[in-house]
Amino acid sequence: MEKTRNTEEEKKMGQKWVKEEHKESTSRVNTGVPVNTGKLSPMMKEYVKTKEEYSDCILFYRLGDFYEMFFEDALTASRELEITLTGKDCGLEERAPMCGVPFHAAETYINRLIEKGYKVAICEQVEDPKKAKGLVKREVVRIVTPGTTLDTMSLDESKNNYLMSIVSIGDHFGCAIADITTGDCFLTELDKPQKLLDEINKFTPAEIICNDAFLLSGVDVADLKGRLGICVFALDPWYFDDQLCQKTLKEHFHVGNLEGLGIGDYDSGIIASGALFLYLKETQKTALSHMASIRPYSAEKYMLIDSSSRRNLELVETMREKQKRGSLLWVLDKTKTAMGARTLRSYVEQPLIDAEEIEKRLGALEELNAKPMDRDEIREYLNPIYDLERLISRISYKSANPRDLVSFASSLEMLPYIKQILAGFNSPLLMQINEDMDPLSDITDLIRNSITDDPPLAQKDGGIIREGYNEDVDKFRRSRTDGKKWLSELEARERERTGIKSLKIKYNRVFGYSLEVTNTFKDLVPEDYIRKQTLTNAERYITQELKDLEDLILGAEDKLYALEFELFSDIRDQVGAEVVRIQRTAKAVAALDVFASLALVAQRNNFVRPKINETGLIDIRNGRHPVVEQMIENDMFIPNDTYLDNHKKRISIITGPNMAGKSTYMRQTALIVLMAQIGSFVPADSANIGVVDRIFTRVGASDDLASGQSTFMVEMTEVANILRNATSRSLLILDEIGRGTSTFDGLSIAWAVIEHISNTKLCGAKTLFATHYHELTELEGKLSGVNNYCIAVKEKGDDIVFLRKIVKGGADKSYGIQVAKLAGVPDSVIQRAKELVEELSDADITAAVKDLTAPKKKQKITYDQLDMAQMSLFDTVQDNDIIEEIKNLEIGNLTPMEALNILYNLQNKIKNRW
């Protein structure tokens, strides 16, 4: 149907229907359109009855070659899809608002509605209109939601499309996750809202279904919708009935008890899983045979990465452009198959914390790179393999077409060659992959022996079954071939008999076969010709002989098409019955694709195999940022070392000017650790990586305007999350803590954060802490495990050169004016800044901080050039009471934090007086 803006008349029609009120018995359709059911036409009564059953969906109601929408659905769809709003006589005084889309293009329109958060119920004609007595029977055959769409054209083949089911019971959460396009299904249980939020951020489902208690659990549902674009639907309580959920799972997996599935101890997880399968059965209207297993997992077995850290580290997409290029995944992904791409993404989003499993992956990569010719040959055989996971899902759904089966067979034909190469490998993981990879030769033979090499896309147009597979198919085809010969002979005889040389036998689906005579020769038409159709320049006729021949030919053709479809459906079902074997093989192919990709990336980029330890040591020599070194074109990336342990080198305070490379250095350390724990080689000369349980980052600053949070509030919220959840096995990347507020507040907060982290009883995490508060370098030697580092800078007169090298010690200058000059700030401003900094140089708060700290080791480096907020308190104020207060301070008994708080209070007093 033509896309266009609604006319004023159409808008008025919609408004009238919204406002109309009927006095007779009514039935409310969707959101506020009363319909007088007593006067509706029979067809519209059926529509309203169906709509009432699926009131939370937009109903696509099949009428001939269109899906039509009526009443409120029509108003919504015409607005969202920008299609014409018309009207339909429905038995009432006013025409019902109506719009429609062609059935052959429906998926495109459905997906546009799904992307906007709507559900769509598809109501099909389930009987042949020619055979129907009265109204054609219609049924809703599927409900499409964001987490249950099957349209491969709209889905990203490199990303799973997850549906998540959550049940909140007391202070616990049950969580089940499924991707119906691949058959994957998992369940877990969590005891805190933050842990649940971490899982949501990890899987980023398209849709969440939940009980009402989840909405009150403390998880910010509005944030899930706004920030992640997740559709959240609360289901009726009966979905979460414990007994019903257990019964549903037992029936689906054909087991007598759930212990056999390994999920018997997951009480809330069982409820979440049962609700998920109830929802899928209701929406999909099918047996879901491809969802043949459910796997329990513990979130504690994977590295925890919160949403902020995922965003800051740009694991799968960049922060600004939201695109793959420029992310870690972009560097690592050289996979050949869609299955491999999805698996690699899951590896990046879920790094391991089991050292033994990590070593297995690293061992597979090492052997693949030791045999590069075999690795490259494997990749060549992987290249033509289609998406086996999503193909078998379509086969199980009975939506796969003949070409899908041919693609499936051509993919399976690659497996024996891959297995032959893998037979020469000895690493445990590659040997396991070879064992799990079933060549599926019986399925290949079935498809190749039954389906033609180039079948049509449609399932009911014939031309599907290979010659020799079925005797009846061959017989009907011969009849059809002979029929064409008979038609040709009849045409020749009629030309001879009538003298009409241009006479032709034509065919169309509506009128069947006919004799076509142009108007020039219609005077020569014999009396036994019966007029059938009038055209602009010709007439079409039928004779008894042609009618008899038509019945014979079309009868054979109809039987042929019906038989071919029946045989194709049977073949498809036979393939679908092997879903477990196929899915296991698909997983093996995907894993092999990932390891071959990671091995190739490691070889091309001079990555090294990291050593994995469980002592907490992180020792990286000449580490490089995996993404930045790919993005810079002509410049050489400057490598840097990182050394962190659980004792004397736990916290590195890093100072230096903006643009010098502090953030890049810290991010590269986090990425190298993460890469090692997904089982990848890393960009360094050598790396000894102690397994970390969590990576937290607090990098950059940005307002969260959508939730009304300032830069500083966002920063403090993230810091609070880190301090609450970091452990002694965590890695923290903290950049410019406290810069979103006043200098004293910011310095105090940053100082207190470092004190908290350094306390092994409270935290003890390994930390890289970048700051402009040079005063924090005073903590070296005073707090256990704190060490100072800075970015080396070379001065050339008034200019500076960033050397991008991390060196021991603290920075002695901020170089703010030089950076401003590099950024293009006007010369007049630069000159005035130089004058001011000289005037303010005596206002050195660092000296005050030094006086307030306890006796300590001699510092190697001093600092100057402080900002306006760091002016001496005594340059302008002569108030005797303030002077007396300072005189009476017992400085030797003050802690650093007490001293800073006193300074802060004194400053406030002065501000209030001036």
Predicted regions and their residues:
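Charged catalytic and DNA/RNA-contacting regions of genome-maintenance
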Residues: 2-367, 376, 383-396, 400-492, ...
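Amphipathic alpha-helical transducer elements in NTP-driven molecular machines
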Residues: 40-44, 60, 71, 100-110, ...
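ATPase nucleotide-binding head domains, primarily ABC-like/P-loop NTPase cores
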Residues: 71-74, 266, 336, 344-347, ...
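Conserved catalytic alpha/beta cores of large enzymes that bind or transform nucleotide phosphates
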Residues: 205-213, 219-222, 234, 545-578, ...
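Charged, surface-exposed helical/loop "interaction arms" that form contiguous linear patches used
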Residues: 397, 401, 411-414, 467-468, ...
